Amino acid sequence: NDLLYCVQVLLKRVPGALALAVTVMGTILAAMTGIIGASVTMMTALALPTMMRQGYSHAMSCGVIAASGTLGILIPPSIMLIIMADLMAISVGNVFMAAVTPGLTLAAFYLIYVATISAAKPSLAPPLPEHLLNVPKGEMGPLIAKSFLPPVFLITLIKGSILLGWATPSEAGAVGAFGATLLAIFNGRLKDGTLVEVCNTSAKTVSMIFFIVISATCFAYVYRSLGGDDVVEHLIVEKAGLDAWGMLILIMAIVFFLGFFLDWLEITLIVL
């Protein structure tokens, strides 16, 4: 809430300030959580009611939340990047560094699109209320510090420990959990039963991921042992006569098609 409010105030003179604030918040949450479900759920609970109250169109509101909320799949420390690095036997740090630019570029395109469509069609993104347009300048410093320092601290703690080689991804996850706990204590939001609920949710998520990993690995081993990959390679390379670029375009089209009915984890484990 503090972050969303702060970014709205900072962008108050820009068309579509609230939608831009939601996109910025989605980018920051992506760099903090590394998982889509957490970002989309949190943004829907925080941002959607606010956008509805301010008169944003349903299509605009849902589109902004869905697009910016899914940045967690690409911006480090994405769980998908960690699994991809393990499957391809590549350093997680290198994969993280390679994904930073595409992730931030996509976020920048979202911001440009939202600002453009808000300026072209003001009815989709009404101006901010008066109380947000008249925030005293003296309140901006403490507001920015309170809103941005905690996420910057957590992002630096997680990514810095990995990129500098101080911790493995698993250890960095523990560091991030410790940092998030400290922030919750500092903000007075660590209540009775919170840690138990977090541990239960984490255990369920990890169990589901491992079940999918085991199932997909068994499928891949059986498929390859029966010569399925050789058949596909023969059809694509020899029959279709595709070069490297043609192969890349075909694979991207297949992944795009699979995305309609499979989650990222299943696609990653099957395709790679």
PLM regions and their residue ranges:
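Alpha-helical transmembrane segments of multi-pass membrane transport proteins
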Residues: 1-272
